[in-house]
Amino acid sequence: MFRKILLAAAIAALAASQAFAATLPEVEGWACGPLRETQLDAVSGHQGQWLEREYRTANGVKFLAVWMEGAGPKLWKPVTEVGEGGETSGGESAEKISVAGHGAMLESRPVLGLSLVVKLSKDGVLTLESQSADRDELTRAAETLIEQMEAEKAEK
């Protein structure tokens, strides 16, 4: 009986950890760097994972993608106020947008480039960062990644 309970608990924990079952996929036609994975462990137990991969689209747009899943991202809520930092902050700006039907925040910093943060699930956040991409290029790249991540999730 104890084994059945333990097995049921393990299956439930595995299913919960695979809520989005995401990884940063290899995209056909893109140059995809190696997937770097960091498990987020603490004294209190496993807290999630951090995945990183560099991409270059077929059009030559280079960006870094980061997928964080676990205890940290579930506390993240998109800000309700957006705007521009003005001259004193170096011209940074932030804007709420929608990417593939998900709430997102697009941040622009003149020296660092663009950062697009998309909340895909209760426990998962996808971030794309690029020094050279424009808004449309980064948004299209995010949409492509999200579509592929969701397709892989549906296959499982």
Regions from the PLM with identified roles:
Residues E81-K156:
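A short, solvent-exposed beta-edge/loop patch
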